[in-house]
UniProtKB/Swiss-Prot annotation:
This is 4-hydroxyphenylpyruvate dioxygenase. NCBIfam families: 4HPPD. Belongs to the 4HPPD family. GO terms for biological process: L-phenylalanine catabolic process; tyrosine catabolic process. It catalyses: 3-(4-hydroxyphenyl)pyruvate + O2 = homogentisate + CO2. Fe cation binds at H196, H279, E362. It comes from Yarrowia lipolytica (strain CLIB 122 / E 150) (Yeast). PROSITE patterns: VOC. InterPro entries: 4OHPhenylPyrv_dOase, 4OHPhenylPyrv_dOase_C, 4OHPhenylPyrv_dOase_N, Glyas_Bleomycin-R_OHBP_Dase, Glyas_Fos-R_dOase_dom, VOC. Its EC number is 1.13.11.27. Binds 1 Fe cation per subunit. Residues 27-161, 193-351 form the VOC domain. It is an enzyme of class 1 (oxidoreductase). Coiled coil: none annotated.
């Protein structure tokens, strides 16, 4: 039976008075992708990345124009939407997005304490509105949401879940009982949550994007590096990490810098046809197991040269830091290390998940370290440049 959904406007103050609610972010809610085949995209993350079915909306639930499959792992939730036909606004929007960008992230949703108050404050400060607050209701309760624009065609949905008890959102049916039989034959993958989502900008657009987050959403500059820190023989980039007031959400923003050849950021902009989400970092508590098991499932990661580990071993020997993991295991899995005297992170990046060299996934583990792998950027860039060269895009 199709779920019954009621949609009503929320009671947003018409005066849009500034409130102190720009600090009400609870964290990432989900990442929404527009793809050509939502069923197959969801299946990829189930079989390759170890996600599980969460919820579904489509013809069987009364959604005649768009279908959405939701999958998750830990607190990570990805929603994949595809158009079922043309001639309806959202379906046509998905078609247009696919033609321009290919399969890609459309929306990064934030869970907040109070949508109406945060939206009011953001509108007063000049946020670009896509959809004013609305309330969705079904038998499991209600959810309030609003949608705002960020860079390019990317949006942020603000979601207030309250005491909602459904699997995902009103209008979806629970699919958590639909276990994929192949899971019994594959290693289990344990992820925690989304650590950060990175957006790429075109030339000289990073500052504008950062100012937008600062001025409208109350974010602040958490961390930054310039082209002197992130460069190779051939290319360079600049990066600023924007964080919500409580630092539960971090959105790094990149732009290309002048180099001898085309950088990975320029390649992304060329094939994505504009600014957008470059990668999503997924946090794990044991990256050795996670990467080993993802490789066993067929996930392809970038390669790191042996010289990186020779240099890293020398750096570690000169510091007081002690790794909990065996260095040999880290090297065997091609995992990158960054550290200071207080802690360290371990990270590794997949190859692009699409035929277009656009979106990829990062697997990250933190041990008392809140940086973003600046010490790895040169090695990472060189590894990505090797892949670019194979594609004829360097």
């Amino acid at each position: 039976m199709s779920p019954s959904v009621e949609v009503t406007p929320a009671h947003t103050p018409t005066s849009y008075e500034v409130t102190n609610s720009l600090d009400s972010y609870r964290g990432y809610d989900h990442v929404h992708w527009y793809v050509g085949n939502a069923k197959q995209a969801a299946s990829f993350y189930i079989t390759r990345m170890g996600f599980s079915p969460i919820a579904y909306k489509g013809l069987e639930t009364g959604s005649r124009d768009v279908t959405t499959h939701v999958v998750g792992n830990g607190q990570v939730r990805f929603a994949f939407s595809s158009a079922l036909r043309t001639g309806e606004p959202q379906a046509d929007e998905i078609h247009a997005h696919l033609v321009k960008h290919g399969d890609a992230v459309k929306d990064v949703a934030f869970e907040v304490d109070n949508v109406e108050q945060l939206f009011s404050a953001a509108v007063k400060k000049g946020v670009r509105v896509i959809s004013e607050p609305k309330v969705l209701k079904d038998a499991h309760g209600s959810v309030t949401y609003a949608v705002i624009s960020t860079y390019g065609d990317t949006t942020h949905t603000l979601i207030e879940r309250g005491s909602y008890e459904g699997a995902f959102l009103p209008g979806f049916v629970d699919t958590s009982a639909n276990k994929d039989p192949i899971a019994a034959f594959l290693p289990n993958i344990e992820l925690m949550h989304i650590d950060h989502c990175v957006g790429n900008q075109d030339w000289n657009e990073m500052d504008n994007a950062c100012k937008y987050y600062e001025e409208t959403l109350g974010f602040h500059r958490f961390w930054s590096v310039d082209d002197k820190d992130i460069c190779t023989e051939f290319s360079a980039l600049k990066s600023v990490v924007m964080a919500s007031p409580n630092e539960k959400i971090k959105m790094p923003v990149n732009e290309p810098a002048v180099g001898k050849k085309k950088s990975q950021i320029e390649e992304y902009i060329d094939f994505y046809d504009g600014p957008g989400i470059q990668h999503i970092a997924l946090r794990t508590d044991c990256i050795l197991d996670t990467v080993r098991d993802l490789r066993a499932r067929g996930v392809e990661f970038i390669s790191v040269p042996g010289s990186y580990y020779e240099n890293m071993k020398e750096r570690l020997a000169k510091s007081s830091l002690k790794l909990e993991e065996k260095f040999e295991d880290i090297q065997a899995l091609n995992i990158l290390i960054d550290f200071d005297e207080g802690g360290y992170l371990l990270q590794l990046f997949t190859k692009p998940l699409m035929d277009r060299p656009t979106v990829f996934i990062e697997i990250i583990q933190r041990r008392n370290f809140e940086g973003f792998g600046a010490g790895n950027f040169k090695s990472l860039f060189e590894a990505i440049e090797r892949e670019q060269a194979k594609r004829g895009n360097l």
